Structures are given as structure tokens and as C-alpha cells.
Amino acid sequence: MSCLDEIKTMTLKLLKKIFSNSLNEYYSKEEINTLFYILIEFYLGINKINYIQDPLYIISKKNISLIESKIKMIQKKTPIQYIIGEVEHKNIKFKVNKYVLIPRPETIELCDWIIFNQKKKCKILDIGTGSGLIALILKKYITGSIVHAWDKSPVILKIAKENALKNNIEINFKIVDILKNVKVNDKFDLIVSNPPYVDKSEMQFIDESIVKYEPHSAIFVEGNDNLIFYKKIIQYSKDALNSNGTLYLECHIDRINFVKNILKINNFKNIKIKEDLFGRKRMIKACI
């Protein structure tokens, strides 16, 4: 029987104490505090300032049970983003679930890099859109641009469409598998992709919660060629980009120089590699 089963009401302060005690063997104090404030704001409408101002606020039995169910999910290493079912980046809320990858900080950095460089409206293609994060951010912050977004999965594309609709952002979605021989029927000024780039042999080094809960198809590369997505995207972009068009890619730190070589072989120019906030070479851009 849970320690919360017999409790009808409790204060926020006591709830926080029980929350912390339930998770201290799994996470640091700072991580636990972050998780607690995310949950009470999302489910109870109580933010950190509210907590500080009124720690003796009474929580109902219903909400105690709700938070307890989330504690159990956290103990099983379920990512908090999947627990609450959404993330927010650059003032855009995105629905996320087990079918789409949880956006990483370096992907937001990639978007910021593109926005900084792209000063005028253009025609954009996001290959492997997932939740639609890159497509929606670029559409919102590069004013007047036309954005297309592809993914091979109808299930994933449905989530991206929901995110676009919820945020009132117009994106042209299409089911396309870039690993197939895709014909060039349209031209773009800018193509961007954050494709799968982790080799399955590296799975043992990946965080348990990622391996257990996030979609492997968005992370790991099937087969023996861990650069296959880059090869296909670069080959397609070579023909699909307008003159002086730009390709942006997020990359594995250990394979970014291989990607650079593929770009050179395909006659891309002005190749630039960018580090993320941690000093890791994670992004690359090139012009055709």
C-alpha cells in the first residue's frame, strides 16, 4: 500500500517532501525540484512562486493520487516530457509522445543558427520533421516563408499536423521516405534535417530512459551504413536546392567530418561547422 493511500488531503509542502523522498534514489535534489515544479504547474496550475508564497496550500485527495501516479512513472524513468505530453520551445507548445523524439537543446540551436543567417523569406523543406519542431519554429520566425515538412510515418505526421494546427502555423506536410529514390518535383531555398545518426552498436552508451521510451527509428540507423540518411539527403538536396540554396544538418559529433566530406564530394561549397553550447561540433551548413 502506498504511503499516500490513506491521506485525504495534504499541504503542498508535505507533498513536496513525499515527492522528494520517493525519488531521491533516482535523481539529484535539483532534478527532483525541477520535476516537482513542472508537475504541479502542469496538473495543478501551481507554479514555483505560488509554492513559495503558500507552501501550506491544501491539495485534494484527487490531486494527491494524480501526482502519485506520475511519481511511479518517473521512478520507471519515463521522460517528464512524455508524462505531461508536451514541450515548449521559442513560445511554441509541441505535443510529444512515444512516436516522436523529445526535442534536444542542440536542435533549438540549429533553428537559431538558421534564423540568424536567413534574413529574408524563403522556401524551406524540413526532412524527417517528427513533432514538427524545426518546421514550426522556422515558419514562425522567418517571416513570410513557405515551409514544407516531410516524414515517412503517417502516425508521426499526424502529430506534427496537430502541433501546427494548435499553434495556428501553416505548414505543407507530406508523407515521404527520403531513403527511397525521391524525385525532385520542387525547388527550395533552404533544406534542413535532423536525421537518425546513432549506430545501434552505440545503444549501450545511451541513457536508459532514451533507449526505453523514445522512438528508435528517430535515433538509431538501421543497417551497416550510419551515414545513409546524410548521403540520401545530400544527394536529394544537390538537385532540389535553388542556386545558392543552403542545406543545414544536425550531426553526430564523431561523424560530422564524414558528413563534411560527403558534402564536398557532391560539390557543395561554403561549408561551415558550428559547435553547440557545450563546445561540441553538432551542426553543419553548406551551399550549392
Go through each PLM region and give its residues.
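N-terminal auxiliary segments of SAM/dcSAM-dependent transferases
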Residues: 2-84
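An acidic site on a long C-lobe helix of protein kinase domains
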Residues: 63, 103-106, 229
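SAM-dependent Rossmann-like transferase core, predominantly class I methyltransferases
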Residues: 54, 68-142, 147-159, 285
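Alpha-helical elements of Rossmann-like donor-binding domains used by nucleotide-donor carbohydrate transfer enzymes
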Residues: 18, 38, 66-69, 109, ...
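S-adenosylmethionine
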Residues: 145, 150-288
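A secondary-structure boundary/capping signal
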Residues: 55, 97-98, 194, 251
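Short, glycine- and charge-enriched coil/turn segments that flank and shape catalytic ligand pockets
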Residues: 60-65, 117-122, 143-144, 180-186, ...
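Short, basic/glycine-rich phosphate-binding loops at helix/coil junctions
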Residues: 46-47, 91, 211-216
